[in-house]
Amino acid sequence: MADRATHHRWEDLPREALNPKIGRRFITGDSMMIAHIYLDKGAIVPKHEHENEQLTYVLEGRLRFALGADGDQVVDVAAGEVLLIPAHLPHSAEALEDTLDVDVFHPPRQDWLDGDDAYLR
């Protein structure tokens, strides 16, 4: 467990290019992770699920999420809006515009830390 606060600036963190349309930066603590996700219009995050609870806060742009095993719950999330995705809920996303979102995960995404997130690449 960390016993000291750490201070970060997004622009000082390396921006990882996951594919030609999606990039990210993230910060990890003991029990949570926060990420800036950069999506070009038309970017697709394929259907996946994870053990982590997820909050997605769109800062700029707009994302369309398909939620559930059949993707039958469709939600558009615009700048200034937040989507809470429970653990183990299948979901995918499409960037309807160039988008910057903040994703918060609890616990941290171990697959991201291990580089085992091939669905994004």
Give the ranges of each region predicted by the language model.
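Short histidine-centered beta-strand/loop micro-motifs
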Residues: 25-26, 37-38, 45-50, 67, ...
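Histidine-centered metal-chelating micro-motifs
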Residues: 44-46, 64, 83-92
